[in-house]
């Protein structure tokens, strides 16, 4: 069973359908007992960082996620950004699960970064075109396992311990997106 954290901001239905299409049972929850029973936890998200953190703190999700060390915790789009320490969007602290910060995209290309872009990585699964929609990005770091070139390097997939971030929308990225999501649900792209 996969637990999708429902904190009130997210593309829950599309992510749910994608995970079910992969053959997993899904539960939408904010309940610690459900999360503890799950094989993996997914934190989806669209919208504003500050609003998302307010909702997460209101529902006591932050401490629950900080105590998960034995299974994948996957953030998608805004969910990936929430995993980090701080965001310039609203100048607010994140979940502080992954070292680093979220900053505005600095590119000569149009913002938001919208549409298909190729991932670059040494991991063979992470070398495909995927669908992005965002104006903020994680800073480049040693935790980036795939990035896209958009006039600057845009982290597309990060992994730090059991925390995996996917900046693009795997549920909107066709077969490759589903394969990437499935690999994340199984534990990610690096071996510790």
From Swiss-Prot:
GO terms for molecular function: glutaminase activity; imidazoleglycerol-phosphate synthase activity; lyase activity. Residues 1-192 form the Glutamine amidotransferase type-1 domain. It is found in: Cytoplasm. It comes from the Bacteria. The lineage of its organism: Bacteria, Bacillati, Bacillota, Bacilli, Bacillales. IGPS catalyzes the conversion of PRFAR and glutamine to IGP, AICAR and glutamate. The HisH subunit catalyzes the hydrolysis of glutamine to glutamate and ammonia as part of the synthesis of IGP and AICAR. The resulting ammonia molecule is channeled to the active site of HisF. Its EC number is 4.3.2.10, 3.5.1.2. InterPro entries: Class_I_gatase-like, GATASE, Imidazole-glycPsynth_HisH. One of its GO terms (cellular component) is cytoplasm. Gene3D superfamilies: 3.40.50.880. Heterodimer of HisH and HisF. It catalyses: 5-[(5-phospho-1-deoxy-D-ribulos-1-ylimino)methylamino]-1-(5-phospho-beta-D-ribosyl)imidazole-4-carboxamide + L-glutamine = D-erythro-1-(imidazol-4-yl)glycerol 3-phosphate + 5-amino-1-(5-phospho-beta-D-ribosyl)imidazole-4-carboxamide + L-glutamate + H(+); L-glutamine + H2O = L-glutamate + NH4(+). This is Imidazole glycerol phosphate synthase subunit HisH. The active site is at residues 77, 169, 171. Keywords: Amino-acid biosynthesis, Cytoplasm, Glutamine amidotransferase, Histidine biosynthesis, Hydrolase, Lyase.
